[in-house]
Every structure is written in C-alpha cells, then in structure tokens.
Regions:
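A structural signal for small-residue-enriched, beta-sheet-centric alpha/beta enzyme cores
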Residues: 1-74, 78-88, 95-401
Length: 401
C-alpha cells in the first residue's frame, strides 16, 4: 500500500464536480455531485444525534439497498430541524439528481451541511445540481472537495493505492469538518470512492469498523452535529476477485487501505479545528479494556482545561491526569505514568519535577503527542484533537449555526 495524489475521481469509473450555486453568502462553491459510471456497493455511517437532519433520513434508506451510484451534496444550509418540508426537499434533491443522471432515486445519497433550521433554497440548489451534473469530469475532484466546506480552512483529501488479488486498487476520499466534532460522527462529511470489488454487506461492516478507528476517534469541541455522514462507494472496476467475507484472503489489504484513507482524513479534521493552533494526539495505554482506553483518551481530549493549557503552552499535567481520573476508566493511581512529547512528567503517580524550560520547546510545537499509562491492563487507544484558542470563541460567536 502506498499513499498517492488524487481526488475522489482517482479510482476507475468515478466523476465529480463542484459548483457555485449561490447558497453560501460568500459566493464560494456550495453544490457537489460524485458519480460512479456503474452501480457501486455502498456502505455508510451517520450521526447518532437524535435531531438528525432530513438528508440523513433519506440517505439511511439508500444505504439499506446495498448499491448506489451518486452522492449529491450542498453546503451553506443543513436542512436540519425543517420538518416535513425539509424531508420533501431532501427527496426532491435526490429525485432531481437521479433524473439528470438517468438512475433510480434510491441510488442517490444526499447530504447537506451548514446553518440549522433554515429551508433549502430549492431553486438555487436544483440549478446547482444541474450545473454540477453538466460539469462531471475526472478532473473536477478538487472543485467537488471545495463545495462541501463550511468553516474549514483547507481542503481535506487523501488517496491510497494497493494491490488486491493482483490488481491495482485505488481508494480516495474527501472530507469536511472543523467544529462540532465529537463521536459518533459529528459535523463531518466524508466521501470515499474505490474501484475494489467487495460485497455490500462486507463493505458495510468494514465502513463501521473503519469509522470507529478513525472519525470516531476525533474530538474538536465535544458537540455532536445533526448531519454527519461517511459514505463509501466501491464500484468493482479494478476487477479483483470479489471480497465476499472477512475471511477472504484479500480482506485485510482492503480494510487496511480503507482505514488508512479514513485516518488521514480524520487527522486533517483535528488539524483544522476551529481556531486551532495545536494538533494534539492523546495516547492511552495500560487500560483494562479498549473501551476504557478510549474513554480516558476522550475525556482528556474533550477537557477545556487540557485544551486551553496547550493553547497557552502550559505543561499543566495535573489537568491531564485529572481528566483520566474522572473519565470512569479503571486505573491504578500509583502506577500512572505520563509523558508529553516523550518527556516523562509523572512516574508511578508522582511528579517527576521536570523544569518548565525543558518542556518549553515541546509545548511550542504545532503537533504534540501525550501518552498516559493507566497501569490497569494491556489495552490502548489513540484520539486526535486540538487546542482551544481565543479564535475558537470568536468564530463560534460570529458564525450563525
């Protein structure tokens, strides 16, 4: 497996486009379409927020069919908390895309992101979808990625190539997300395309596992959104022997490439946390169970006191062990070890009295890793997050959600 350059059009048989439909006040790209020239196995996971948006309800039904061919997306309006009209608008968005592409409506996923509680500007949206369909091309992957952004500061995309059954297989993905990031799936839109041949039921299970290893290990601010969706389309044009079960000899290579692509995108979202100045990796080891390791890591990653300490470049390790302690994870206080940037600060639950000046260069870095051993077992987990800055408050004070 190797990392490569490419957009969602890198795998065989995929076209995409993003256009400016006038939904965003900024005038930026705001409508996108991704299209597979042949039916593709699909797998998706969606927000766990009980106030899920209309497009999530529609797309959940698409996912049940096992096969799909297109994804239609708009940014600038979430179509959430919009009642029956919102649901009707999402279905119209789906039907319009399907008609233009000459496929069945149930083969089209729909996604929206942006301001909650407002109706979609349907005239602009439908015109935008038509323009995007007219613009579909292998060379329009970047414009597609631009069109799904809201408060993002950079385009998020990743691509990998691997060999499966003697065939070259490509995985490529795009994502958006910068705020309201918290499992399970939160203010993230993620679309991954691949030309691997895999059975729909196998793909569905793999997507869920991949999300648990990547996007569900990212925290920016602890808020869970209404619209999050991770959708994977696999059209089989690589012509490898179809992967029919997890026991297939090629399953592991397929799954590793899917996770690699998803993990890259997840880390980019943490890097792009609203107002972030630091990318933080929280490693928990020595846990009694994986669930405990994740629980402790999440508590640390979500803690405003931990996040603001890193923004201030203050090695306040007490906040880290405190968060682990109240997380509910099993731990042995007199066996806890903690390091930041490889420098041991706590040994067997006691202060190592490291001079602040020794830690200053580490705390000044953009990417910082911390590791805490709970002393309770052998399990581990890693969560990615960012700091909290003045800019985060400014952005969310000014951005109308």
């Amino acid at each position: 497996m190797k990392k490569t350059e490419g957009w969602v059009t890198a795998p065989q048989g995929f076209l995409a486009a993003g256009v400016k439909a006038g939904i965003k006040a900024s005038g930026n790209h705001d409508v996108a379409v991704i299209f597979s020239t042949v039916p593709a196995a699909c797998g998706a996971v969606f927000t766990q927020n009980k106030m899920c948006a209309a497009p999530v309800l529609v797309s959940r039904e698409v996912n049940k069919h096992g096969y799909a061919q297109a994804i239609a997306v708009n940014s600038g309006c979430a179509n959430a908390c919009t009642g029956e009209q919102g649901l009707a608008d999402a279905k119209k968005m789906q039907a319009h895309t399907a008609e233009l592409l000459g496929i069945a409506p149930e083969a089209v996923f729909v996604c929206s992101t942006g301001v909650i509680g407002q109706f979609l500007p349907m005239d602009k949206l439908l015109t935008g979808i038509a323009d995007a369909v007219d613009s579909l091309d292998e060379c329009e992957g970047e414009s597609c990625a631009m069109a799904i952004q809201t408060t993002d500061t950079f385009i998020k995309h990743a691509a990998y190539e691997t060999e499966i059954g003697g065939k070259k297989v490509t995985f490529a993905g795009i994502a958006k997300g910068a705020g309201m990031i918290h499992p399970n799936m939160a203010t993230m839109l993620t679309f991954i395309t691949t030309d691997v041949a895999v059975a729909p039921d196998v793909l569905k299970r793999a997507v869920k596992k991949a999300a648990d290893k990547s996007f569900n290990m990212v925290v920016v601010d602890g808020d869970t959104s209404t619209n999050d969706s991770m959708i994977v389309l696999a059209n089989g044009l690589a012509e490898n022997e179809i992967i029919l079960s997890e026991e297939h000899p090629d399953y592991q290579a397929f799954f590793e490439a899917l996770v690699a692509c998803a993990t890259d995108l997840a880390k980019m979202i943490a890097h792009d946390g609203e107002g972030a100045t630091k990318f933080l990796e929280v490693n928990v080891t020595g846990a009694a169970t994986w669930e405990d390791a994740k629980t402790a890591a999440m508590a640390i990653a979500k803690s405003p006191l931990v996040k603001t300490a890193f923004f201030g470049e203050d090695p306040n390790w007490g906040r880290i062990v405190c968060a682990a302690g109240y997380s509910g994870a099993a731990m042995e206080a007199d066996k806890v070890n903690l390091s930041i940037g490889g420098i041991r600060l706590v040994e067997n639950g006691m202060n190592c009295n490291v001079p602040a000046e020794k830690l200053a260069p580490t705390m000044a870095e953009h990417d910082i890793s911390m590791s805490i051993d709970l002393g309770a077992g052998e399990e581990s987990a890693t969560v990615w997050t960012c700091d909290f800055s003045y800019e985060y408050v400014k952005i969310n004070g000014e951005y109308h959600t």
